[in-house]
Every structure is written in structure tokens, then in C-alpha cells.
Amino acid sequence: MLNIDKLIIGFDSALRTLLAPANTLRPVPGKDLPENELSEIEKRESAALMRINHVGEVCAQALYQGQALTARNDRVRQALDQAAREETEHLAWTERRIAELGGRKSFLNPLWYGGSFTLGLVAGVLGDKWNLGFLAETERQVEAHLADHLQRLPHQDVRSRAIVTQMKVDEACHATMAVSHGGGQLPAPVKVAMKFSSRIMTRTAYWV
């Protein structure tokens, strides 16, 4: 059940996600790799793809925070909080890499955050089985989208590739965690709707 303390924590988390630089406890993947020379076209492509990945992490933060607010089981809430901390690291990694590439973050991050937070709240209200099932499916789709980015990133952009590779590993772990905690299999129409929404987000974030 929602209470004032949880709402304050949620509001603080939203401000930190959208306005404050993200922090990471783990070393940034690829930080010791060489910064190979990229053409302007390659830099723009890498920056756009990393912007999409950053938006994905903004959405993940919002989703986890919304789900944690309405989760009914303390064990589930703790698992969501742990995953959210790892997603914060992804936020920091992508943010840093965008800056290194001379790119910018999406202007629509508040919109992405608000929509994902609402989805997280709704998923949590439906109960932990569907809450975790929604999380697992989200992470599977994110993992697939990161695999696609590994195909699209310039081969010589080894720093971006190292970050995306580690993110892909972490997302797979989050999906496994959600299933192990009792996540249910979502109906096929819900999965299709999620893919459609994700496609709109990624195509928009590529440019905006």
C-alpha cells in the first residue's frame, strides 16, 4: 500500500534520475580500452544508439520505482530495489559515454519517465506474479534490443560496445531474477503491445 514516505522516496528518485548525474559502484566497462578514431557519421550513430540506451535506463528506473512502490511482498521489493541499483549504474555508463561522443540525452526523458512509472505502478497493483512477469518480459525485450545495437555500433567503437555488452548480461540476470521470484508468463497480446511501444520509443529517442 502507498504511504507518504514511499511517495517522498519515489519523488526523490525521480528527481535524481532526471536531474542529477548518476553514480556507479562498478568500474565503467571499457574505460581502459582505447578511444579509437571515429568518423563524424560513426560518432553520431554511436551517440544516437547510446541515447536510446540511456532512455531505456531512465524507463527502467521509473518502472522499478513504480513497481517497488506497489509490490506486496518485501522479498520482491528488495529484489526490485537491487535491480534498480544496477540499472542506475547503466544510467551512469550511458550518460558518460554520450558525453564522450559529444552527444546529448533525450529531450523527452521526463515523458519517458512518467509513462514508465505509471506502467510500474499498474503492474504492481496487479500483484507480484504479474508485476514480476512484466519485469521479466521487459528485460528480455531490452536484452534483444541491446543485441541489435551490438550489430549496429561501429566495430571500432570498443568502449560503447563494452558498455552495451555488460548491460546485456545484467538485463538477462534481471529477467532470470524476476522469474525465480515467481514472475508469470504474460499473454501474447501484452507482449506484442510492449514491443510496439518500445519501437515507438527507440525510433523517437534516436532523433529526439
UniProtKB/Swiss-Prot annotation:
GO biological process terms held by the UniProt record: ubiquinone biosynthetic process
Cofactor note: Binds 2 iron ions per subunit.
Entries under InterPro entries matching the protein: COQ7_proteobact, Ferritin-like, Ferritin-like_SF, Ubq_synth_Coq7
Cofactor needs: Fe cation
Cellular-component GO terms for this entry: plasma membrane
GO function term, MF aspect, one: metal ion binding
Catalytic reactions of this protein: a 5-methoxy-2-methyl-3-(all-trans-polyprenyl)benzene-1,4-diol + AH2 + O2 = a 3-demethylubiquinol + A + H2O
EC number: 1.14.99.60
Protein localization: Cell membrane
Record bears the keyword DNA-binding: no
Pfam families documented for this protein: COQ7
The entry's keywords: Cell membrane, Iron, Membrane, Metal-binding, Monooxygenase, Oxidoreductase, Ubiquinone biosynthesis
Main location: membrane
Pathway: Cofactor biosynthesis; ubiquinone biosynthesis
Entry keyword Cell membrane: yes
Amino acids binding Fe cation 2: E87, E139, E171, H174
Membrane topology note: Peripheral membrane protein
Binding positions for Fe cation 1 per the UniProt entry: E57, E87, H90, E171
Protein function: Catalyzes the hydroxylation of 2-nonaprenyl-3-methyl-6-methoxy-1,4-benzoquinol during ubiquinone biosynthesis.
PANTHER family, A to Z: 5-DEMETHOXYUBIQUINONE HYDROXYLASE, MITOCHONDRIAL, COENZYME Q10 BIOSYNTHESIS PROTEIN 7
Family affiliation: Belongs to the COQ7 family.
Name under which the protein is recorded: 3-demethoxyubiquinol 3-hydroxylase
Origin species: Nitrosomonas europaea (strain ATCC 19718 / CIP 103999 / KCTC 2705 / NBRC 14298)
